[in-house]
Curated annotation (Swiss-Prot):
Protein name in UniProt: 3-hydroxyisobutyryl-CoA hydrolase, mitochondrial
Domain of life, source organism: Eukaryota
Binding sites annotated in the UniProt record for substrate: 120, 145, 168, 176
Gene Ontology BP, a term: valine catabolic process
Function: Hydrolyzes 3-hydroxyisobutyryl-CoA (HIBYL-CoA), a saline catabolite. Has high activity toward isobutyryl-CoA. Could be an isobutyryl-CoA dehydrogenase that functions in valine catabolism. Also hydrolyzes 3-hydroxypropanoyl-CoA.
Pfam families xref list: ECH_2
Compartment(s): Mitochondrion
Family: Belongs to the enoyl-CoA hydratase/isomerase family.
Disulfide bonds: none
Record-listed E.C. numbers: 3.1.2.4
NCBIfam families (alphabetical): PRK05617.1 (NF004127)
Keywords: Branched-chain amino acid catabolism, Hydrolase, Mitochondrion, Transit peptide
Amino acid sequence: MSFGRLESQLRLKVFGRLQVIRQHLRMSNHTVKDGGCLLTKAGCAGVITLNRPKALNALNLGMIRQIYPQLKLWEEDPETYLVIIKGAGGKAFCAGGDIRAVTDAGKVGDRLAQDFFREEYILNNAIGTCKKPYVAVIDGITMGGGVGLSVHGHFRVASEKTLFAMPETAIGLFPDVGGGYFLPRLTGKLGLYLALTGFRLKGSDVQKAGIATHFVESEKLSSLEQDLVAMKSPSKENVADVLDSYQKKSYAAQDKPFVLAENMDKINSLFSGNTVEEIMENLKCDGSSFAMKQLQTLSTMSPTSLKITFRQLKEGASMSLQEVLTMEYRLSQACMNGHDFYEGVRAVLIDKDQKAKWKPESLEEVTEDYIDSCFTSLGSRDLKL
């Protein structure tokens, strides 16, 4: 072998070894920047920063594929004691899933329409079963997919800037990402009300509703994060103590009554119907301004979505999170194969004319046989957790 060739091979070996070392350093001590997330080790914590501020940190498949393996690594890492997830840009934690991309994929039969929901729900389950304390800082807009990244974790910290909603019935979908699990477990019929109407909760009301575990003023969140990552080998109880101490410093918003407090009796009675049609009839018969407003809101939603959502929460009330996510994957694929999801996205997100033409256009035309088919097992294509 010539000296030149030997020298060339040695250079390649050294270069290869350097690449491995660089990769290791990036993962162990530095921020991983590829894709829409920043994954950082800071003190005792693994920190996930959703980093698509121009898109309000909307969750796409690339981000899911970043977060899931890193979450699993941190879960097994003896030097990582908690996980913190937050959003960049100051406006949003995460405004939802990247629905436009999913819609485009579904129209042409692209696998993304399956992969996105499947991998998103697998991530939701990983968050719900995470062995390390998981702290979601939901400062800003938190909707749909953003709720899935937060609500199943141990701790959810809202601020005065938090805006929560599950608005899926307006786009021909349903409140997924485990909505069938956490929504029916809220007080009374609050979860069903939020699911059907897409009502938006703001600030401390997100905690009062039982969605956030803590409320901390936005200006204190940076200091809170510093105190969390500076802890030495913290337990879940230690993390809770720090969060509790910060909540005690945020008095003002907690003195206000819950935004829906004066209407909770009506919500519990009017939304206790055995069908969506019964709920609509209850609202008509009540005749109050509150009832009429809800009737008007529901009349703009996809009738198919309303019926799917009603059944989803009814079934989910007695299911495990894993069973709910399996059910919701079936529902996601039914929506991908239907009409209303594409029409809803067109009307709300693309053309923005807010004039969706639903098919069927009335609740009465949505048959129980069709709803049953949406919940049917996909066999070998079912989500397995």
